[in-house]
């Protein structure tokens, strides 16, 4: 993604009222929604179509960024998500793309491929993913670090988006495009929760 063309929409909805936010009380819920390459003006343009308890609530009570930029080139989805979720640049989180060449071995590296884990509820060889190459903690990791009772869930259509956004300690799920249902890996669970 090109920096000028990239519009990142980050919504943080804090269910605690604004008065409790001013007193420093911990929010009961933090929701982080990233819509890659969505034009920021769409939030204002379509606000009349949003319900009071949906995106309209995010706009009124949360925070959204209409002009987010990265201070590095060349941006791409994986590096951008890692920067958003960790608060650091690629030299800090280790993600430069979904695939790259390790200059020390001249071997290709996939961001999330991890032969030490197994995909859950999917065909053999599918879903063998983890945050193996993500070298920084995400916001979710920090939330769990500060309070072990925190619930951190990352859900996305693709494993890269789910894993990079969720980090090391979240409950992470992504869509198995071949079978059309949510899956994860043994990095995150021994077995999938019953739905």
Regions found by a protein language model. Name each.
Residues 27-39, 58, 84, 143:
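Beta-strand elements within well-structured catalytic alpha/beta cores of enzymes
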Residues 34, 38-42, 51-55, 77-81, ...:
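Stable alpha-helical elements in mature extracytoplasmic
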Residues 43-92, 151-155:
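Short, structured active-site-proximal loop/turn typified by the sulfatase FGly-forming signature C/S-X-P-X-R
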Residues 88-195:
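His/Asp/Glu-rich, glycine-adjacent segments
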Residues 1-5:
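Positively charged n-region of N-terminal signal peptides that target proteins for export
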Residues 7-16:
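Bacterial N-terminal signal peptides
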């Amino acid at each position: 993604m090109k920096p000028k063309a990239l519009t990142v929409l980050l919504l943080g909805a804090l269910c605690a009222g604004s008065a409790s936010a001013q007193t420093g009380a911990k929010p009961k819920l933090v929701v982080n929604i990233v819509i890659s390459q969505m034009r920021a003006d769409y939030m204002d343009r379509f606000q009349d179509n949003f319900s009071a308890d949906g995106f309209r609530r995010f706009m009124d009570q949360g925070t959204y960024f209409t002009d987010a930029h990265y201070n590095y080139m060349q941006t791409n989805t994986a590096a951008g998500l890692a920067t958003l979720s960790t608060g650091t640049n690629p030299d800090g989180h280790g993600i430069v793309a979904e695939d790259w060449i390790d200059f020390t071995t001249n071997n290709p590296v996939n961001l999330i491929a991890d032969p030490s884990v197994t995909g859950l509820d999917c065909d053999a060889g599918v879903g063998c993913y983890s945050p193996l190459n993500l070298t920084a903690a995400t916001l979710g990791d920090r939330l769990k670090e500060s309070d072990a009772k925190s619930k951190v869930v990352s859900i996305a259509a693709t494993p890269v988006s789910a894993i990079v956004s969720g980090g090391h300690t979240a409950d992470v799920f992504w869509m198995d495009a071949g079978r059309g249902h949510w899956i994860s890996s043994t990095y995150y669970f021994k077995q999938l929760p019953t739905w």
